[in-house]
Amino acid sequence: MTLRIGVVGAGGRMGRQLIQAIHAAEGVELSAAFERKGSSLIGSDAGELAGIGHIGVTVEESLTDRADNFDVLIDFTRPEGSLEHLACCAAKGKNVILGTTGFDDAGKAAIKAAAEKIGIVFASNYSVGVNLVFKLLEKAAKVMGDYCDIEIIEAHHRHKVDAPSGTALSMGEHIAKTLGRDLKTHGVFCREGITGERKRDEIGFSTIRAADVVGEHTVWFADIGERVEIAHKASSRMTFANGAVRAAKWIADKKQGLFDMTDVLDLNNL
């Protein structure tokens, strides 16, 4: 049976990549596409927007009125919009792949509450490679973390509105959890002026925003005389789109629960 997927933010960079990925994947179809109220793209053919030709799926405005047209919704938009979409899907019993970043604590609580009614995959990054890196970071932290300085450097395109990236924060959280630290108290997100010596238990973050960088993350485990670097560089958003489609297939038969790509890829059994 073909899985019907809906995409919100269909006219954005990520939305178009998602449409392409769904079109190319087996066992799924794009059955609904949505854009924000007042968008000039409403009424357009989603396939033509994504550059794959006419597919007969019209970009619409109202998610609520068209929720019966999809089985799983993929959302890579903004926190305020994503929470509205999530509430609609929870009311309609539709599972969600959530790739939006930048949620505050209240937003994260709303996601957890919705997961009591529907299945949700919530991940900061849907790249298979990045999620493998998360696992490698845990192993490196276990071996080196208490004996070295840890720094996370991330770079993205000039249009990204949040910093550090959700992926960088997830990397920090994986490391902090492994070391028994709290990222809220051990994370250092800005250094300026006379900062004093670096504390050994800090987890530092550095952010770069430039041009059209898709996404690059490098983590240093730096000791005196040697440094281990674990890095991931994305050259195309298609890697994120393909991962999201893979997650949509995985979540299709789940009744409820909050999951991430570790669950989708079964990384805990590596």
From Swiss-Prot:
GO molecular function: 4-hydroxy-tetrahydrodipicolinate reductase; NAD binding; NADP binding; oxidoreductase activity, acting on CH or CH2 groups, NAD or NADP as acceptor
Name of the protein: 4-hydroxy-tetrahydrodipicolinate reductase
Binding residues annotated for NAD(+), in chain numbering: G9, A10, G11, G12, R13, M14, E35, G99, T100, T101, A123, S124, N125, Y126
Entries under InterPro entries matching the protein: DapB_C, DapB_N, DapB_N_CS, DHDPR_bac, NAD(P)-bd_dom_sf
Subcellular locations according to the entry: Cytoplasm
Function: Catalyzes the conversion of 4-hydroxy-tetrahydrodipicolinate (HTPA) to tetrahydrodipicolinate.
Associated pathway: Amino-acid biosynthesis; L-lysine biosynthesis via DAP pathway; (S)-tetrahydrodipicolinate from L-aspartate: step 4/4
Organism of origin: Actinobacillus succinogenes (strain ATCC 55618 / DSM 22257 / CCUG 43843 / 130Z)
E.C. no: 1.17.1.8
